[in-house]
């Protein structure tokens, strides 16, 4: 099958969409390519789920190692559980796609994106997002699309569209923006403390390119002879919503104005109103239309009650400018922060609370060997900063089985991780591998931003010299027609009733991470800019509270944290330190009880809980790699004797040999007549042969114990020895 191919060019980079050729039994499919990266995206619609009160949409990004010319390293030589990055890309597809389906839709929809080939210069994620829209359109699924996504980088002062992996690494911005003809529907970014204006301009720059990809999808649909199926709301039974509006509006509205109520009390009173209403309906005659509807659909009362509560809350915010807890639209909840709340067995800890949201973060310092190896398709180095986010059921007063982290936990952890990375100290000056774990102890909105704040406190408590502290706030939005209200620091109920969840993290200087999700089909850049700017004073206020808890890194590390020494050796001498079969480096680690890591560039990192042991290991390695010159004089101990001479350790780990003829001016019959093992002697380097062997002499050297060292390289400690 030939299929149809449409191309769109950006700055000399061409994106190709091929339809009608692959996966003919899928509802819709497209092969989307850029360079040598190719992603096959399919969308298929199933039957509706009976009794479902949500959209059963699943989005899966599948990596195949053959895409990078590799064979899996597992025993079965088959791909196993998706790596973390695949999970994050699955979320990246889901987030802009989900709000474009009608909220009444209950059909199973499955989108599968499979990376068939990966070019090291072209990331596959944005291709998968755009492809998901094209496949959905071709499948004939009711959909408020088209939707497309692009990536924006910043090199110097110039924005770069769809940058390569290397350009992303070198640049100060990694921003993904997805949009529809109505506006922006999703934003995700990490940046190197960029200003609010820079980020807004980057979103605007990206959205212009999004429109080109939207036009390409519309063209493909037209050329295929297909018509986009626009969602049409089915006729719904309005008897129950009408009854609730008539009988429950007053008590709900009155309750929403009781600003002093706690979340728990408000929820209980709402349940009371719903229960009273249900009892009234139950007392109606059996042939009453409302009672019949409730009997037919047992979930209808709960769904309709939630919808009415949501409507009344939104009206209160739009008309009165007051939220359910009485806060002004730009007001942050009460904040508390505390550092070092756990014993120093934990290297660093911080407790951050904002309203009813409470997060405990811990920081652990590890050695270079603790870095996380990234076993995925992307050409990425090992991770030296890791953030894990846990959301146990008790945090929302519920019970459920404790399982492995889900997509939400992985996504929130990645966002908090991205927010901190720009302020981490350089590896050369602080070579620790860092792991932060954020335990959500109580949740009422914005736990991911609470994790960012808790991480900062824990890292400073652990003695990590951050460039600047980072805080975060979640922004919300209520939009009714032309009326727009932006909410600062949204809580759980406002996330439910609102149209946007916009998380912004950064330092006093600028933004380090942001993530925007919509429940609308698009939002103008102007409103997005207002939300970003409104987040700045909130972040500053939160930072001030955090600094009161801890304003700089601890001067001393936990006594239970490893001590690291780092210095550089000639890369050509790495083999000398490692030795045949690793014998030399193994001997050093056993002798000094340390852990030693050597990078390809020659950076040696020694880890030990004993600073003296680390220094001893450093001296041995420096001795092994130090160049010895003819004529130098050393004092060392006799380590072993052979019939033709004696070996002397002239430097830690480095030996030379005194030939029997060089032991004395006089003739020597037996080596032991002059020296024995353990004797301390002063020797001169007579020559270094072409195999690097050091030949020594005792002739003419006064044996008075004097030592003369060739100038030693000055070690560069990366963390203080304590």
From Swiss-Prot:
Domain called KH: residue spans: 562-621
Co-factor(s): Mg(2+)
Main location: cytoplasm
Cell compartments where the protein resides: Cytoplasm
Sequence ranges assigned to domain S1 motif in this UniProt record: 631-699
A GO molecular-function descriptor: RNA binding
Role: Involved in mRNA degradation. Catalyzes the phosphorolysis of single-stranded polyribonucleotides processively in the 3'- to 5'-direction.
Recorded family membership: Belongs to the polyribonucleotide nucleotidyltransferase family.
Identification of the protein by name: Polyribonucleotide nucleotidyltransferase
Species for this entry: Prochlorococcus marinus (strain SARG / CCMP1375 / SS120)
């Amino acid at each position: 099958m030939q299929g149809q191919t449409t191309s769109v060019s950006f700055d000399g980079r061409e994106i190709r969409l091929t339809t009608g050729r692959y996966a003919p039994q899928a509802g819709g499919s497209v092969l989307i390519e850029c360079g040598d990266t190719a992603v096959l995206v399919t969308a298929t619609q199933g039957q509706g789920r009976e009794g479902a009160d949500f959209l059963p949409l699943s989005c899966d990004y599948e990596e195949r190692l053959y895409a990078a010319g590799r064979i899996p390293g597992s025993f079965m030589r088959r791909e196993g559980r998706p790596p973390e990055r695949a999970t994050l890309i699955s979320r990246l597809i889901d987030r802009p796609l989900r709000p474009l389906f009608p909220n009444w839709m209950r059909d199973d929809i499955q989108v599968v994106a499979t990376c068939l080939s990966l070019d090291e210069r072209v990331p596959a994620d944005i291709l998968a997002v755009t492809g998901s829209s094209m496949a959905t359109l071709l499948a004939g699924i009711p959909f408020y699309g088209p939707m497309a996504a692009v990536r924006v980088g910043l090199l110097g002062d110039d924005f770069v569209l769809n940058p390569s992996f290397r350009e992303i690494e070198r640049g100060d911005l990694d921003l993904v923006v997805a949009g529809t003809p109505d506006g922006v529907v999703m934003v995700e970014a990490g940046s190197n403390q960029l200003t609010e204006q820079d980020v807004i301009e980057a979103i605007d720059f990206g959205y212009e390119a999004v429109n080109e990809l939207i036009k390409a999808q519309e063209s493909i649909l037209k050329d295929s002879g297909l018509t986009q199926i626009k969602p049409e709301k089915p006729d719904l039974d309005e008897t129950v919503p009408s009854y609730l509006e008539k009988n429950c509006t007053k008590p709900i509205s009155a309750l929403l104005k009781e600003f002093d109520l706690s979340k728990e009390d408000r929820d209980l009173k709402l349940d009371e109103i719903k229960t009273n209403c249900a009892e009234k309906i139950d007392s109606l005659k059996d042939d009453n239309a409302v009672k019949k509807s409730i009997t037919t659909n047992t979930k209808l009362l709960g769904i309709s009650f939630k919808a009415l509560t949501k409507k009344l809350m939104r009206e209160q915010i739009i008309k009165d400018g007051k939220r359910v807890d009485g806060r002004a639209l730009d007001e942050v909840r009460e904040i508390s922060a505390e550092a070092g709340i756990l014993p120093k067995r934990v290297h660093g800890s911080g407790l951050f609370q904002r309203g009813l949201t409470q997060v405990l973060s811990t920081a652990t310092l590890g050695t270079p060997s603790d870095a996380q190896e990234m076993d995925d398709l992307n050409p990425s180095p090992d991770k030296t900063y890791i953030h894990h986010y846990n959301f146990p059921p008790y945090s929302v007063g519920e019970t459920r089985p404790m399982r492995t982290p889900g997509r939400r936990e992985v996504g929130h952890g990645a966002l908090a991780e991205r927010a901190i990375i720009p302020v981490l100290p350089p590896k050369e000056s602080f070579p620790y591998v860092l792991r932060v774990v954020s335990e959500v102890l109580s949740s009422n909105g914005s736990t991911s931003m609470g994790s960012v704040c808790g991480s900062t406190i824990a890292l400073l408590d652990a003695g990590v010299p951050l460039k600047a502290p980072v805080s975060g706030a979640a922004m919300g939005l209520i939009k009714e027609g032309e009326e727009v209200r932006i909410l600062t620091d949204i809580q759980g109920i406002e996330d439910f009733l609102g149209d946007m969840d916009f998380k912004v993290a950064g330092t006093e200087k600028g933004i380090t991470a942001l993530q925007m999700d919509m429940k609308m089909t698009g939002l103008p850049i102007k409103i997005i800019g207002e939300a970003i700017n409104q987040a700045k004073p909130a972040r500053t206020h939160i930072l001030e509270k955090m600094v009161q808890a801890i304003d700089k890194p601890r001067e001393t590390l936990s006594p239970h944290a490893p001590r690291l020494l780092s210095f550089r050796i000639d890369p050509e001498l790495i083999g000398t330190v490692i030795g045949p079969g690793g014998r030399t480096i193994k001997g050093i680690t056993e002798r000094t009880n340390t852990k030693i890591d050597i990078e390809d560039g020659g950076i040696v990192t020694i880890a030990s809980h004993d600073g003296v042991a680390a220094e001893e290991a450093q001296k041995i390695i420096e001795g092994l790699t130090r160049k010895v010159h003819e004529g130098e004089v050393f004092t060392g101990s006799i380590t072993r004797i052979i019939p033709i001479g004696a070996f002397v350790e002239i430097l830690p780990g480095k030996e030379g040999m005194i030939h029997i003829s060089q032991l004395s001016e006089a003739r020597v019959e037996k080596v032991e007549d002059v020296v024995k093992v353990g004797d301390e002697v002063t020797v001169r380097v007579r020559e270094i042969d072409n195999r690097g062997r050091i030949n020594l002499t005792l002739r003419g050297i006064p044996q008075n114990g004097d030592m003369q060292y060739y100038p030693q390289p000055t070690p560069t400690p990366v963390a203080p020895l304590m």
